[in-house]
Amino acid sequence: MFCVQCEQTIRTPAGNGCSYAQGMCGKTAETSDLQDLLIAALQGLSAWAVKAREYGIINHDVDNFAPRAFFSTLTNVNFDSPRIVGYAREAIALREALKAQCLSVDANAHCDNPMADLQLVSDDLGELQRQAAEFTPNKDKAAIGENILGLRLLCLYGLKGAAAYMEHAHVLGQYDNDIYAQYHKIMAWLGTWPADMNALLECAMEIGQMNFKVMSILDAGETTKYGHPTPTQVNVKATEGKCILISGHDLKDLYNLLEQTEGTGVNVYTHGEMLPAHGYPELRKFKHLVGNYGSGWQNQQVEFARFPGPIVMTSNCIIDPTVGSYDDRIWTRSIVGWPGVSHLEGDDFGPVIAQAQQMAGFPYSEIPHLITVGFGRQTLLGAADTLIDLVSREKLRHIFLVGGCDGARGERNYFTDFATSVPDDCLILTLACGKYRFNKLEFGDIEGLPRLVDAGQCNDAYSAIILAVTLAEKLGCGVNDLPLSLVLSWFEQKAIVILLTLLSLGVKNIVTGPTAPGFFTPDLLAILNEKFGLRSVTTVEEDMKQLLSA
């Protein structure tokens, strides 16, 4: 096992990465190794997808499957080894079908990629794990060095984050052939184990640029189906009655659940990154969507154990449900998996609803505590002139985007302390689950404009980018000249691709934490600092002083 993709990876003087029987996320060495094997199979599939496009062949089954299966290897998504192997087998079957399509056009069709003809050696998980050793990401570290390995992983993990957003967009009916062609090209190239530093740096920026387009179609999918988010108050306390909790990012799953629970007497609560759903008109119209429950994903083992109903996980993040003994009432959807828990294959939530009706639910309603979400792209753009006016009248000094992933590391208190230290004449724009560090606190307003503005899920960084570009255009300056600073927390691969997106767009002087990714070497950090001004957090006092004086 070698995995260094998330923030909580093991870090030692000898090197970084989880390489024992189990990773810090709870992933076993078996599952981790089989995920490496799956990625190799997906690289071979993408290699043939690139070749097929040369013949004008676009196989939508391949395009739909490839990013979804890659998503299953993201942190805290799928811990179920047999399902990972199932994805690998499906990848190979689709590859062979695509290869046959190419051969039907050109009998001499050939794909010159090391992964293009990969076959699984056995049905036995142990044998497959041994085969997977050929594809462990650091297998040639001694030959290529830490810097090249780090850049490879930056590209692989960044592309994995983009694949997750591609799947979210696909679920909502969004497809862009150019994006999929670019995805397959990059995925196939990474399967050649590239070792050119400049080419890898260029690839990282290409992934960021591609992801901006992915976030655009995802935004279009969400707003077309569910309307543009508008500011909405959400209760974060319990309401009497039977209940279901839904976590993750998939708004379509939430909509289906709300439709199927309507009139059943079962209330629905959002958790984690599902919180922004309350801002969408077509979702909040359901009166039994009663509130948001819990805090950051890392606290779920305590909070889920206390929730008096079933729980549905639609995407990341799931962690071991046996710890809180709620594994008999947690359900996984789509690419999510945990050994031994119930998995919903389709869109029928009937079994979950039936379980909710058999459980006690909340015995009484607590005194409401309301927070505000729903500052989507249209709302943010509608406030652009107000922001400019406040800046011109020196009522608004600075905007801080404080957001990103949450996690368990104690140093993440930095983001709470930073938010509460922001001066009263400054605004905090937030997104993703890092907001749970401070989103239940009171920040007041500036002439009626809330000082804490929740823009949505991690992918809604797109809205923040569009706002920044709009403000820069209106003020006749560059984005980097705005009174705007980005203070971002990271945990997994979606955060990595958001960072690459920002860097590829030329955004500079981003501050990140609580630690640097484990695959970043000192040399890579120095390169990113020199090119983009990217740096790690220090202390709240020093960072605040520097950002306000920039």
From Swiss-Prot:
Residues that coordinate or bind [2Fe-2S] cluster: 3, 6, 18, 25
Bound cofactor: record note: Binds 1 [2Fe-2S] cluster.
PTM sites of type Cysteine persulfide: 405
A Pfam family matched in the record: Prismane
Residues that hold hybrid [4Fe-2O-2S] cluster according to the record: 249, 273, 317, 405, 433, 458, 492, 494
Annotated localization: Cytoplasm
Single Gene Ontology MF annotation: peroxidase activity
The keyword Nucleotide-binding is annotated on this UniProt entry: no
Entry's Gene Ontology BP terms: response to hydrogen peroxide
Record protein name field: Hydroxylamine reductase
